[in-house]
Curated annotation (Swiss-Prot):
Inhibited by dTTP, which binds to the active site and stabilizes the inactive form of the enzyme. Inhibited by inorganic phosphate. GO terms for cellular component: cytosol; protein-containing complex. This is dCTP deaminase. Belongs to the dCTP deaminase family. GO terms for molecular function: dCTP deaminase activity; identical protein binding; nucleotide binding. Catalyzes the deamination of dCTP to dUTP. Pathway: Pyrimidine metabolism; dUMP biosynthesis; dUMP from dCTP (dUTP route): step 1/2. Its EC number is 3.5.4.13. Keywords: Hydrolase, Nucleotide metabolism, Nucleotide-binding. Changing residue 111 to T: 30-fold decrease in kcat. Shows altered dTTP inhibition. Homotrimer. It catalyses: dCTP + H2O + H(+) = dUTP + NH4(+). Disruption phenotype: Mutant accumulates dCTP.
Length: 193
């Protein structure tokens, strides 16, 4: 059962759930909290790689990822990031979220953006118990026109679901947690699997 707005506010007030900066009450809806787009992005560079062998030797996968991913792009206030049709880009939420070991989060994109062809998360919309950091967004423009994305715009909504008990291996305590405490648009770390 997901938390309702009243319970989301109570968990925030009690410090069991942290969203920083804390959203105003107007952004806490029936069962969700609106999140905004941050100012950090990462894209695929122009490259000549025919493919990336995801199951190949880890050092080769790592080198291939380094060749095809851009450095982090940080926008100044008022600047726009343009996502063209058929392009994939990583971005980050403005808000940093910390979940306790007994709560899982879910990110959903906005329907109004999806109707323009913008996918906010390609597949990864679960936020694990024990997570702490900004949430990386996996943007894909499946529409026909470039989309201008500006930091601060509403980009999605988080919902929260209590677990039957605290996780024994929450994300923040796992040795293999590849994206622990991320604050930027961190590229794939599949080579760490």
């Amino acid at each position: 059962m997901r938390l309702c707005d009243r319970d989301i506010e109570a968990w925030l007030d009690e410090g069991r759930l942290s969203i920083n900066p804390r959203p105003p009450v107007e952004r806490i809806n029936g069962a969700t909290v609106d999140v905004r787009l941050g100012n950090k992005f990462r894209t695929f560079r122009g490259h000549t790689a025919a493919f990336i062998d995801l199951s190949g030797p880890k050092d080769e996968v790592s080198a291939a990822l380094d060749r095809v991913m851009s450095d982090e792009i940080v926008l100044d206030e008022g600047e726009a990031f343009y996502l063209h049709p058929g392009e994939l880009a990583l971005a980050v939420t403005l808000e940093s979220v910390t979940l306790p070991a007994d709560l899982v989060g879910w990110l959903d994109g906005r329907s109004s953006l999806a109707r323009l062809g913008l996918m906010v998360h390609v597949t990864a919309h679960r936020i694990d118990p024990g997570w702490s950091g900004c949430i990386v967004l996996e943007f894909y423009n499946s529409g026909k026109l470039p989309l201008a994305l500006r930091p601060g715009m509403l980009i999605g909504a988080l919902s929260f679901e209590p677990l039957s008990g605290p996780a024994v291996r929450p994300y923040n305590r796992r040795e293999d947690a590849k994206y622990r405490n991320q604050q930027g648009a961190v590229a794939s770390r599949i080579d760490k699997d």
